[in-house]
A protein has these predicted regions:
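Active-site pocket-lining/capping segments in soluble small-molecule metabolic enzymes
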Residues: 2-123, 127, 141, 145, ...
Length: 821
């Protein structure tokens, strides 16, 4: 395999991290600006820094991708458009995007700028890659939940495929997580995830009993280990992946340096035909940051072995145990299993009280003060309060490794490009300077001054070399010099410096153009950012009820539901049969109501054929609508012309550009993101080309995950077949005593629901009057009797039979009146 087909892609949340990535051997770097990126808490880059970064990266033949991977509100489209123009004109190599509205807008105003589908787009199958290509994506970043075989299938579609190889994992499918949003108003889809998955939780039953009490389990039940693929990197390369992505825009530059350095060596060894990873690289990777390591879902579906349930952050490396304590308990003898150096940071996993840390500032070995100590030796160091005999000692910071890492981005770390110089000085002619880099690019400069005979000191090669060697502010260093000259000539130093500067600038231009030819600059556009507001069509809003059993369909119809949405992710753990779909359709038709079917939000490769067949069945049943929740199912469903397709909630519809995208895709309707406010909903209704739907009652899904906490901790999932009873009520309990229901769908995926039901009884009439075409009750977490009561209540409110009550006790109005950050 040629090297050009493999791209090592590094993160950069700061200038130092960018330099570290380039110097350590990255082929490409991804980073974010001050807005519209999914890591809003990183330092990120302003426009001046971005331009500087493009120059620096391209000079070293490193590609630069910019994250524009948040959901965007209509009020931000003007600023976004200006940003897109800037990114196009400054010469970045591509954008990583989530929002289909951003994709549509970028294609309209900066059509030459390559677009990559972010992992936030939840591409989970090869048909999802087809969808992304159809939407204009040159590359798809796959969901981290795919196996090697599934990645291979995605790679077969003719698009570039990017996959994560190292770093932090999300427990939820990226782009499908509302946990941070619903708990604290900080939306991961808007780049402000507060990482509540790294907090402690209890696993509770219906009686609020801790199911893990007394068991060998930690509290961080949603905190995965870090991904590390060095053991299986050849299999990923063989699968056909083009870009190998290291996670870590929030990480310090030392982390970037060490991880990129190790993966660079690993990839190069594969390309050389002798794959190996030195033990030193494995140790460095572990030391720089780890929550312990996993290959995630690449080799199999893991359970508890994927989780860092005892610690959600850097655990360091175990280097020994406390062998002795002095009587004051402030000095300890540590028996070392690994070397220790002055300046190292240590953490003691103490028996009582958790963990305490210190930095080694003085160390005795055999009674002598030492700078370092080897494995097997015993050293005496100062320790903090709380340390006891036999406590484990972890090194969380290795001073020598940090010094090594800082060589990649410190003041002396500049990675320079060798140039060969030819200087001519002929009497009666300008002096010329020709610089040639290691790839044959040439820069030329000459003096305004005409070379004269020397009156005093003649110019010699040493003098020329001294001036040509002054390349400190450039990206070059002088590799060789040829000085061709007449005898006894002179040229002022200032003139020579100017010719050198001209040659450097010309070489810059040649080198940059050879790597990334300039695209057409765009300074204005005619695209209308937001459609003209129109008066919403006057019609009665349809009450939609989402059911996952025929029993609930019957209850909802009897209570007055006008549209039944059947199927999708079924919280009763039962896969609806063909007979179930037929029964539901028959009941709905008999009642004279609208029938709709729903797909799950996650579809893996092996399930594509099943759903292709299911669409044929649905076509025969003639539903009024089919709700699509997975982008990979859109191309399959479009083949069935009789189906009226609706873009459902999981597709993250947040702005009018996205609504126009779905109209152009042939959608018959769209369901808005639950992260929108009432004001945003009203605005979108006024400009939408499609009928819109909003959720008004039920528990919002906070997470969907291939990981199952019940199966992992109670069902011995890691040992093979899961023994956990999915019908057993299960909850996550947090530090504030909130209880989040856990349900398992028909594909054994875990869904975590909000602790509070969404309820809009007090506002549903207003939503109907505002023109929301369909109002949804999610009945999947209710029993049939309770669902019937709720449907009847909303039917009466919308019909004016009862005065709209205040919201039901213990419920929430979600984001309708608070929004997200």
């Amino acid at each position: 395999m040629e090297k050009k087909t493999i791209e090592l892609l590094a993160p950069a949340g700061s200038w130092e991290a960018l330099v570290a990535a380039v110097n350590a051997g990255a082929d490409a770097v991804y980073m974010g600006g001050k807005a519209f990126g999914a890591r809003a808490y990183a330092s990120n880059f302003d426009e001046e820094e971005m331009a500087k970064a493009v120059y620096f990266a391209h000079m070293h033949h490193v590609r630069l991708y910019i994250t524009v991977n948040t959901l965007v509100d209509d009020s931000e489209l003007e600023a976004l458009s200006a940003y897109l123009l800037f990114l196009n004109n400054v010469g970045v190599d591509g954008l990583i995007v989530q929002d289909l509205g951003v994709i549509r807008l970028a294609q309209k105003i900066v059509p030459e700028l390559p677009l990559h589908a972010s992992t936030q787009m939840s591409i989970t199958n090869s048909s999802g890659v087809d969808f992304a290509m159809g939407a204009g994506m040159e590359r798809s970043v796959l969901a981290r939940e795919l196996s090697l075989k599934e990645i291979g299938a995605a790679c077969s579609r003719g698009s570039e495929i990017e996959t994560f190889i190292h770093g932090a994992l999300c427990v939820c499918y990226s782009g499908q997580c509302l946990m941070s949003s619903l708990i604290g108003g900080r939306s991961g889809n808007r780049g402000r995830c507060a990482q509540p998955c790294r907090l402690p939780y209890k696993l509770l039953n219906a009686k609020d009993e801790d199911m893990l009490q007394g068991k060998d389990a930690g509290q961080y039940l949603l905190s995965p280990k870090d991904m590390n693929t060095l053991s299986i990197l050849p299999q990923l390369i063989d699968a056909g992946v083009v870009s190998y992505k290291i996670e870590g825009r929030m990480k310090r530059p030392e982390y970037v340096a060490v991880v990129v350095d190790a993966y660079r060596r690993a990839i190069d060894s594969y390309l050389a035909g002798d794959y190996n990873v030195p033990e030193e690289d494995l140790a460095n990777i572990e030391q720089i940051f780890n929550r312990d390591f996993t290959t995630a879902y690449l080799e199999r579906r893991p359970g508890r072995t994927m989780m860092s349930d005892r610690r959600p952050n850097n655990r360091g490396v175990l280097i020994g145990r406390v062998a002795k304590l002095d009587k004051n308990r402030n000095k300890a003898v540590i028996k070392l299993d690994k070397e220790l150096h002055l300046g190292d940071g240590l953490e003691f996993w103490v028996s009582v009280g958790g963990r305490v840390g210190t930095t080694v500032t003085d160390m005795l070995c055999g009674g002598n003060s030492v700078q370092s100590a080897a494995p097997g030796q015993q050293v005496t160091i100062d320790v903090p309060n709380g340390v006891r005999l036999n406590d484990r000692v972890f090194r969380t910071l290795d001073s020598r490794l940090m010094s090594y890492a800082q060589q990649f981005f410190g003041p002396d770390a500049k990675k320079r490009i060798p140039v060969d110089a030819v200087v001519t000085a002929r009497l009666g002619e300008p002096m010329t300077v020709t610089l040639t880099d290691d790839e044959g690019n040439v820069g030329y400069g000459e003096t305004d001054f005409i070379v004269e005979a020397a009156r005093k000191r003649a110019l010699d090669e040493a003098g020329v070399r001294k001036q040509l060697d002054r390349l400190g502010t450039t990206e070059y260093f002088l590799n060789s010099l040829i000085f061709e000259h007449d005898e006894n000539v002179m040229v002022p130093m200032s003139e020579m410096n100017e010719a050198r500067r001209m040659a450097c600038e010309a070489l810059d231009a040649a080198r940059l153009n050879a790597f990334a030819p300039a695209r057409t600059a765009v300074h204005s556009f005619s695209e209308q950012l937001v459609p003209q507001a129109h008066k919403a069509k006057q019609h009665e809003s349809v009450l939609v009820v989402h059911c996952d059993s025929v029993e609930k369909v019957n209850a909802a119809l009897q209570a007055g539901a006008e549209r039944i949405l059947f199927g999708g992710d079924c919280f009763n753990h039962q896969l609806p049969s063909e007979a179930d779909y037929a029964k539901a359709a028959k009941l709905v038709r008999k009642a004279g109501r609208q029938m709709a079917f729903a797909t799950p939000r996650i579809i893996k490769e092996v399930q594509l054929a099943y759903f292709d067949k299911l669409f044929t069945l649905w076509e025969e049943l003639q539903p009024d609508f089919v709700y699509i929740n997975n982008n990979g199912l859109w191309p399959l469903a479009k083949k069935h012309a009789a189906l009226n397709l609706v873009a459902d909630m999981s597709l993250n519809i947040f702005n009018s550009q996205t609504l126009q995208f779905w109209q152009e895709q042939g959608a018959a309707g769209a369901v808005l993101s639950p992260e929108l406010t009432m004001a945003q909903v009203e605005h979108l209704v006024s400009v939408s080309p499609l009928p819109l739907e909003c959720m008004i009652q039920g528990r919002l899904e906070m997470m969907v995950s291939e990981y199952c906490v019940g199966g992992s901790f109670l069902g011995a999932l890691d040992k093979g077949a899961c023994r956990f009873n999915c019908a057993e009520p299960l909850f996550l309990g947090d530090r504030k005593d909130a209880r989040f229901p856990i349900v398992t769908d028909q594909f054994c995926r875990m869904h975590i629901l909000n602790a509070h039901e969404l309820s809009m009884t007090a506002n549903v009439q207003h939503m109907a009057e505002a023109g929301v075409a369909a109002l949804r009750i999610d009945g999947r977490d209710y029993d049939a009797a309770r669902l019937g009561e709720l449907v009847a209540l909303y039917r009466k409110i919308l019909g004016g039979a009862v005065e709209a009550p205040e919201n039901l006790p213990g419920t929430t109005r979600g984001h309708y009146f608070r929004g997200v950050m």
